[in-house]
Curated annotation (Swiss-Prot):
InterPro entries: Tscrpt_rep_TraM, Tscrpt_rep_TraM_sf. The lineage of its organism: Bacteria, Pseudomonadati, Pseudomonadota, Alphaproteobacteria, Hyphomicrobiales. Negatively regulates conjugation and the expression of tra genes by antagonizing TraR/AAI-dependent activation. TraM may either bind or modify TraR or AAI making them unavailable. Alternatively, TraM may bind tra promoters preventing TraR activation. SUPFAM superfamilies: Transcriptional repressor TraM (SSF109631). This is Transcriptional repressor TraM. The keyword rRNA-binding does not apply.
Length: 102
């Protein structure tokens, strides 16, 4: 029979978080998860603002590259990476905590 950790690591995106959070009190894990959700929300807003500021030719994909476009891409990478952390923390926690708007 597989251990609980082995089963969990098969279901999560960022397996190192399983080890990093092992043994944490549930309240601490919930706080980490809520903070990660809030950070993700900020990153979504930032990426959206940068996308909205792009010229239409970039939004439509007719043009690519350049400093402004790269800033948007970097923000999107950060946002998606944070979403992986959020998803993993929610899997470890076992539920989606109530993360009120900050």
């Amino acid at each position: 029979m597989e251990s609980e950790d082995a089963t969990l690591t098969k279901k999560v995106e960022l397996r190192p978080l399983v080890g990093l959070t092992r043994g944490l009190h549930p309240a601490d894990l919930e706080k980490l998860t809520i903070d990660a959700i809030r950070a993700h929300r900020r990153l979504v807003e930032k990426a959206d603002e940068l996308f909205q500021a792009l010229p239409e030719s970039y939004k439509s994909g007719k043009e690519v590259g350049g400093p402004q476009h790269l800033c948007y891409i970097e923000a999107s990478i950060e946002m998606h990476a944070q979403m992986s952390a959020v998803s993993t923390l929610i899997s470890i926690l076992g539920y989606i905590p109530n993360a009120t708007v900050n």
